[in-house]
């Protein structure tokens, strides 16, 4: 299965990950089905953000409220592995809910896409997805956005 993302959004994710070498970055993936329309940067509120992420619950609630009001749906989230690979870790698998959501993981100057499922091929929780860049999609937005894509 292939997930689509804009080249600007992919660049944003790579640049954000590279600019945070000591902490995992994280955010929400908005869109429909396997079409990523927008990335929304969120604060990492994890107690140990250097090797774990937790999306700010207020940002998650706000995104779900916006979706109920006609905005794009939350279809997943993204995070980085500052010193690791762009692959789900055993910790990611332990924290993942097998709900079919998309996980984008940045690490080693790469971004990979995964679907959280029961009995996945990676750590029993994730199946790999192909990631295809397309242009003309909405750029990342959010309070932590460090680059202007307008």
Q: What residues fall within each predicted segment?
A:
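Conserved beta-strand-loop surface patch within small alpha/beta domains used
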Residues: 1-74, 82-150
């Amino acid at each position: 299965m292939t997930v689509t993302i804009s080249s600007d959004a992919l660049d944003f994710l790579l640049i954000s990950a590279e600019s945070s070498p000591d902490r995992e970055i994280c955010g929400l993936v908005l869109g429909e089905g396997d079409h990523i329309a927008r990335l929304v940067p969120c604060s990492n509120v994890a107690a140990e953000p250097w090797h774990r992420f937790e999306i700010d619950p207020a940002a998650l609630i706000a995104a779900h409220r916006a979706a109920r009001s006609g905005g794009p749906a939350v279809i997943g989230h993204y995070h980085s592995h500052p010193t690791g690979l762009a692959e789900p870790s055993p910790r990611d698998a332990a924290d993942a809910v097998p709900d079919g959501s998309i996980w984008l993981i940045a690490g080693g100057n790469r971004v990979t896409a995964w679907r959280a499922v029961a009995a996945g091929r990676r750590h029993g929780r994730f199946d790999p997805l192909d990631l295809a860049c397309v242009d003309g999609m909405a750029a990342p937005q959010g309070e932590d956005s460090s680059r202007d894509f307008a």
